[in-house]
Amino acid sequence: MKKHIFFAVALAGAVCFAAELFNGKNLDGWVSVADHSATGGYLASEPTWAVVDGAIRTTGTPFGYLRTKRSDFANYRLKFEYRWWRGTEKPNSGVFLRLSADTGTFIPRAYENQLERESVCSVFALGGAVLEGVAPRTPYDPADALSGIAAVPRKVSSSEKAMGEWNLFEVEVNGDSVVNRLNGVELNRVKGLKTMKGAIGLQSEGGAIEFRNIVLEELP
């Protein structure tokens, strides 16, 4: 029987219910979506996603994501640790918020917290998701997964640790806003989210990355 750990967190007079989204043993509760085309760079010799020493590990190929089976997360605080476990010059990944579970493409309709080292904590609207007041780079075309991307870059210096070290990422999603903190430092604050609920996703986008201690506190 699958078990989740639930506990209550008192915060500013409100009680939030928290759950560990990853049990540290297997990928129960998660669904993988991947691009197996040539552009995905699929390496058959290694699994895209695996559990290694209590962490979710991805090789970064093929491109795609691992999402929660639950797809109605609305307002919450999400905390997790991540590290780049195998070095590349510009490792890339991200975490998807309010991801539409009916998206079948390797880039979903969602908001992305960027983890790529040069732009960590930047926020993107993907796959037709809307950030009010932020114009997309190109008009959205459902036939083109890379179209319609809107971005709010991080405007302060990164607080990310060196390659191979664990980082603590905290994101608060509440109403139309998202606030990102990395290792205790607020790096970005964005308003204008129009999608109000969805799944949570971990991205495979070329970077060899690990995630652990993934805890979500739902807000009232």
Regions found by a protein language model. Give the residues of each.
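Sec-dependent N-terminal signal peptides
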Residues: 4-13
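Carbohydrate-interacting regions of secretory-pathway proteins
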Residues: 18-220
